[in-house]
């Protein structure tokens, strides 16, 4: 097997594969034939610089076609792609290099200094540079499902980022979620907005669309809510994949409106508030299908395509995946997950994430095992509190954590970022408490409300609850 051969070379050469939109809105379209040729020639250049089967190639390239060419070139050779987000600093890159020892680096023109500052002594290929696409095309290596293909680092929500190694089967295995959750169809244009460098982008930016015969949209530039909607309309996007934070921001800060081209939308990476799901369905005309997975596992469950969406739920296990709840924790049988990382554990994989399952088999996320708040014997998921507070018009973003309490053991502490036009006050804090009591069970309301200008987050945008718990963020 070889992803480059099986899904790029084998596709109709005239079929649209990629649409790239630069920050200045310059536009580039590439067919599968063009991607096959350019990635094969780039693979020839990588091979000439010493990269081969099993070698790690680090990429530090933004959401542009050059990044896709580099990833596919690695897989053509049987090399291991290590995509890195552009937000990483030299110290972050150096730590990754020390862990996985890349043979060479493919870097865009804006981040050469960051790579140089690491002291990396191997070859560095700067893109765009047409000379790298002039080598003789490299033939696809014959690979097995367990041959390594991709190494990604966990986001470090609860500790130092660690590498996770995936095999060739991870790439072809994306067909499961692409069909049953992501929802790509032949001829679609799919836009996964995740930045290059994360596991979500590695599987959904172009792999998931391609295994279903669809095209992928790559857009450079910072997140701007109104521009996000403009791009969906201008490019006639069929399938949209965004982080819940982005869906919330677009709903609250942009002029959300009917999006006639958009047939399907998915969210993953953190829980999606029920009110945001409803707002998108009512205003944009599309139901957002939440999903769940991990860096180690790939997608595990998602809101099914077809039945009505259940706002607030992350759906059901994908077909064939054996997933269950044990003492409140999500567990899975690695043997049933086609995208599980190499060298799986003996026995079940305990995710460390907590959820409940209703009588219809739908899963409802509660939080990380160490995020669940135990107050006076009540088990409170932070997402429940956050969802309640997020429906208040003054709230832009919020996070709930436990705070020590002599009587109750712990109480709920909410840290709130306000929308423009609202100022922190004791009166507003009391108003938010009463709002939460009205929106959810009274025992869940935050007995402590604090205001902050922003929430501490990892480079991938996840809230650092541990930082909030120790009080250093406010």
Where are the model-predicted features located?
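Conserved pre-ATP/AMP-binding loop-to-beta segment of ANL
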Residues: 13-16, 136-153, 160, 183-189
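Conserved AMP-binding/adenylate-forming core of the ANL superfamily
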Residues: 14, 18-64, 68-72, 89-94, ...
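ANL superfamily adenylate-forming
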Residues: 22-24, 28, 104-146, 160
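Conserved AMP-binding A3 loop
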Residues: 28-33, 149-173
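Conserved structural elements of the adenylate-forming
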Residues: 36-44, 145, 164-185, 193-194, ...
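AMP-binding/adenylate-forming catalytic core of the ANL superfamily
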Residues: 88, 240, 325, 334, ...
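Conserved AMP-binding/adenylation subdomain of ANL enzymes
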Residues: 172-192, 196-239, 252-253
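Gly/Ser/Thr-rich phosphate-binding loop
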Residues: 237-242, 251-309, 322
């Amino acid at each position: 097997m070889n992803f480059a051969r099986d899904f790029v070379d084998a596709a109709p050469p005239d079929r649209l594969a990629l649409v790239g939109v630069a920050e200045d809105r310059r536009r580039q379209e590439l067919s599968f034939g063009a991607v096959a040729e350019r990635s094969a020639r780039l693979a020839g250049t990588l091979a000439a610089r010493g990269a081969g089967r099993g070698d790690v190639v680090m990429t530090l390239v933004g959401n542009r076609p050059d990044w896709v060419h580099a990833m596919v070139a690695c897989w053509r050779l049987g090399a291991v792609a290590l995509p890195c987000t552009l937000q990483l600093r030299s110290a972050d890159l150096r730590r990754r290099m020390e862990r996985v020892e890349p043979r060479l680096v493919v870097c865009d023109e804006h981040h050469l200094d960051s790579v140089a500052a690491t002291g990396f002594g191997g070859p560095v290929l700067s893109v765009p540079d047409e000379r790298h696409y002039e080598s003789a095309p490299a033939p696809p290596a014959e690979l097995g499902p367990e041959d390594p293909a991709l190494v990604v680092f966990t986001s470090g929500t609860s500790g130092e980022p660690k590498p996770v190694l995936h095999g060739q089967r991870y790439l072809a295995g994306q067909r499961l979620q692409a069909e049953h959750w992501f929802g790509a169809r032949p001829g679609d244009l799919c836009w996964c907005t995740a930045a290059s460098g994360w596991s979500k982008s590695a599987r959904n930016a172009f792999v998931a669309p391609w295994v279903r015969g669809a095209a992928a949209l790559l857009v450079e530039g910072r997140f701007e809510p109104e521009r996000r909607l403009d791009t969906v309309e201008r490019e006639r996007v069929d399938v949209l994949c965004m982080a819940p934070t982005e869906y919330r921001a677009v709903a609250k800060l942009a002029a959300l409106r009917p999006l006639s081209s958009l047939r399907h939308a998915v969210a993953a990476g953190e829980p999606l508030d029920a009110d945001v799901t409803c707002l998108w369905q009512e205003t944009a005309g599309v139901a957002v299908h939440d999903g769940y997975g991990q860096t180690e596992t790939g997608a595990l469950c998602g809101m099914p395509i077809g039945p009505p969406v259940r706002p607030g739920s992350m759906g059901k296990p994908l077909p064939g995946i054996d997933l269950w709840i044990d003492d409140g924790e999500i567990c899975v049988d690695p043997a049933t997950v086609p995208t599980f990382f190499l060298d799986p554990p003996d026995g079940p994989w305990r995710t460390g994430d907590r959820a409940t399952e209703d009588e219809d088999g739908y899963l409802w996320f509660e939080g990380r095992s160490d995020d669940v708040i135990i107050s006076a014997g009540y088990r409170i998921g932070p997402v429940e509190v956050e969802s309640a507070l997020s429906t208040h018009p003054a709230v832009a973003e919020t996070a709930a954590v436990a705070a020590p309490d002599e009587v109750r053991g712990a109480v709920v502490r909410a840290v709130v970022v306000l929308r423009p036009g609202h100022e922190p006050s004791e009166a507003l804090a009391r108003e938010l408490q009463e709002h939460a009591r009205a929106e959810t069970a009274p025992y869940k309301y935050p007995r402590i409300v604090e205001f902050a200008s922003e929430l501490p987050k990892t480079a991938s945008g996840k809230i650092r609850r541990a930082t909030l718990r120790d009080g250093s963020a406010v």
